[in-house]
Amino acid sequence: MRAVSKKKKTPENVIALNRKARFEFHIEETMEAGLALEGWEVKSLRAGRVNLQEAYVLIRRGEAWLIGCTITPLPTASTHIKPDPTRTRRLLLHKKEIARLTGAADREGYTVVPLDLHWKRGKAKLSIGLAKGKKKHDKRADQKEQDWQRQKQRLMKHKV
């Protein structure tokens, strides 16, 4: 009998990426949080109608909240409730995880940012990261490194 391999997080499982977060911050630690969602939000996530670009995580009174995430309702959403695309959504974390994030985020220059939204066993999960803001020269250095990697790939492609 052959061993069953564990399913890894593949691009098919990813709903939305916050590419801006990795450019503007040094990510020091990542963790996964559940989301308290309404039915119409889950349907919109399945359709891929979500934007994490301006989203951030706020920890207040022992609870973690996702603020600024836009989930656009489907045109066929429920008629008896009025969907709010930018409502504040509660993140589902253990108390120890919230305490660790609170202590770390209180330090100067640190924040908690959403990295990506993905499916795990049929549930929507949010990867969040403890991050420290980059300086302008760090961003420039990263941009130069990306350009150099791209040029190397082009050169190797044309040599072969």
Swiss-Prot record:
One of the Pfam families matching this protein, by short name: SmpB
Disulphide bridges, residue numbers: none
Region: Disordered, residue numbers: 130-160
GO biological process: trans-translation
Organism: Alkalilimnicola ehrlichii (strain ATCC BAA-1101 / DSM 17681 / MLHE-1)
Record field: compositional bias (Basic residues): 151-160
CDD domains associated with the record: SmpB
Gene Ontology terms, MF aspect: RNA binding
Record function comment: Required for rescue of stalled ribosomes mediated by trans-translation. Binds to transfer-messenger RNA (tmRNA), required for stable association of tmRNA with ribosomes. tmRNA and SmpB together mimic tRNA shape, replacing the anticodon stem-loop with SmpB. tmRNA is encoded by the ssrA gene; the 2 termini fold to resemble tRNA(Ala) and it encodes a 'tag peptide', a short internal open reading frame. During trans-translation Ala-aminoacylated tmRNA acts like a tRNA, entering the A-site of stalled ribosomes, displacing the stalled mRNA.
Family: Belongs to the SmpB family.
Upper taxonomic lineage: Bacteria, Pseudomonadati, Pseudomonadota, Gammaproteobacteria, Chromatiales
HAMAP family xref list: SmpB (MF_00023)
Protein name: SsrA-binding protein
CC terms in the record's Gene Ontology section: cytosol
